[in-house]
Amino acid sequence: MDLKNRISKLKILKKELQKSRSEILKALEADLGKSMEEAYLSEYLMTLEELDYTIAQVPKWARPDKKPTPYYQFPSKGEIHYRPYGRVAIAAPWNYPFLLAMVPTIGALGAGNRVVLKTSRKAPATSQVVQDILGRVYDPEEVLVYGLDPQDRARFMAEDMDFLFFTGSTRVGREMAKLAGEKMIPCVLELGGKSPVIVFGDQDLETTAKRIIWGKTLNAGQTCVAPDYCLVQKDLRDPLIQAMNQAIQDFYGPNPLESPYLASIIDQDHFRRLEDLAKAQGLDMEGKAWPQGLKFAPQVFPADPSSPFMEEEIFGPFLPVLTIDDLEDCQKVINLHPNPLALYLFSQEEKDLNYILDTIPFGGGAFNDTLTHLSTVTLPFGGVGQSGMGAYHGKYSFDTFSRKVSILKKSRKIDLDMRYPPYENFDPRKFFKK
């Protein structure tokens, strides 16, 4: 798809998104129990921001990059040209079924690719909306959407593809990496892991608590970069827990299960998994679980590294709080798990951030906030190690979904004979310093 045509189609897509806003928000409410406000802020608005940014910037991104050439190539010019891979396969998860289907699709289309998209059957209402919107803008040869049929996963994996982009669990990510290897194509894996939030040094505990609880309870904790557990100095643990419990009450009222702003757990299997963890931890669940509505009241509680909640990514509104003596202790706890997708540090000192950056590998994060790096279109988003590989968003999506073609332009006016054989009279010391 040439540049003019892809921009034109993206502008039409924007109009379709705006016309379908109510339909999108209702679908997210049906699938995940999200309030209209949360669905708007965390999925619809972020998708629109990505689309606007891509439309505005893609003409600049698509221009060849000029590069210097070494003296022994004189006279010449170097260029990097950006070309689409061809057909990009994108597998989207259920937890942000609109955002995480549309944003990589926008990036792939902006780079001139065709797309085959697989949405999640766990979010059927949103999957249908995504399919309908894209179907009104693109022909099936340009964008093909799978997701609602039980056989769609197998059909998706059997499709011809030149690039694979997957968001989801590490377990399925391994399957997708194997698929990419079998097809001999590049892939990006956006996975998950246990993302810590560290609270260190003097704090405005009220603001710190609000930002942590917001990041933890958005989408009922079903966010790949949600704070999974908290590490805090011993003398701050109890005041911080008290402040976080107050934030929960401020956000969701005295009975969070009745709040319209608390999203649901996706299905009974995930609900039972979280319920079993809570029981194993010994948490008081009376009045804090609603099986029929698939909801849990958010809970913050003291824990240690042996906690059942520390065995795997939680993906729910439960926050274990562990104590540390210093930042070296953070390393010890974090290194018990694979590299996290995100890390959050609350501190007054920039040197604390530099220490974390120098000693702990993680995908990305925020300093004195949570989640917000994910919604910043000018920053790349991606993991490291078992939390993923590759990155996207904005310009980084364009780069990810583009082949880099190197071109050296050589002048015909000057031709140095020394490059050609025979070399009997060639003395490299006359021409090269090495």
Regions found by a protein language model. Name each.
Residues 1-79:
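N-terminal Rossmann-like NAD(P)+-binding subdomain of aldehyde/semialdehyde dehydrogenases
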Residues 246, 295-434:
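Conserved C-terminal structural/oligomerization subdomain of aldehyde/semialdehyde dehydrogenase
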Residues 138, 172-305, 367, 428-432:
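ALDH superfamily catalytic-core signature
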Residues 6, 51, 112, 143, ...:
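Residue-level signal for inorganic ion chemistry
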Residues 71-207:
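Rossmann-like NAD(P) dinucleotide-binding subdomain of oxidoreductase/dehydrogenase enzymes
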Residues 14-17, 21, 32, 55-62, ...:
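Structural signal for hydrophobic packing residues in well-ordered secondary-structure cores
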Residues 158, 191-193, 223-225, 258-259, ...:
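Short glycine-enriched loop/turn motifs at secondary-structure junctions
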Residues 3, 21, 205, 237, ...:
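Residues at or immediately preceding the N-termini of alpha-helices
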